[in-house]
Amino acid sequence: MPSPTRHMFLLAALCLTASICSPAVAAVVATKSYSYFDIKGKTADELDQQLSTRGPTASGSSARHPGATKIRFGGEATYIQDGGRCRVSHAKVTVHTQIILPRWSNRNGASKQLSMIWDTLSSDIKRHEERHAEIAREQAKKMEKRILALPPQRTCEAMQELVTVTSTRGIEEHDRLQARFDQVEAVNFQNRILRLLNNRIKSSGGVH
């Protein structure tokens, strides 16, 4: 009778882890939470300044951002030894995302024009951060499939090492995907915001 062995195989934080005839089982666990930081202002310049000084910082940087998504990967795998070979019998990848968004606390009394600009910008910030969370969930699924597809090894120690290497590579790939997304978004930011603002103005019948 083969004996299962369970090990934690990955844990990473970003400012972005039976019987012999049973098939390998996967179970991605994704959770998401939200938090907010308050900003104040009566003009677009004041709101912009507040975002620049009160926004969250990204991992490894002191620069402030209008929004952020903290990502934490984790997981565990169960290995089963039989016939001189060890394989993964169960893998569970977890990913928790915390989306940090701005909240305009003294909006009452603001002009319709400024409110429309803010609604356009804040909606785009939320969309951007939600996409970061989605990229993390998609990568967790890829990592899980790759781990379950790994070939059996001579020992469970070797199997665990291979899982660790695969997990590390998956997280590195995740970081590159997130950076590429940010680069594309930055290039298109101004045109995108102007287009969204024009669409919002048209749908509301204009700003008075």
Predicted regions and their residues:
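Metalloprotease/metallohydrolase-associated module, dominated by Zn2+-dependent proteases
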Residues: V29-G109, Q153-H208
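Structured segments of extracytoplasmic/periplasmic soluble domains
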Residues: D124, H132-Q153, E173, L177-V184, ...
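Mid-length scaffold segments of soluble, non-membrane domains
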Residues: C86, H90, H96-M143
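Sec/Tat signal peptide C-region and signal peptidase I cleavage site
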Residues: C21-A26
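Bacterial N-terminal signal peptides that target proteins for export
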Residues: M1-L11
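Bacterial N-terminal signal peptides
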Residues: L10-I20
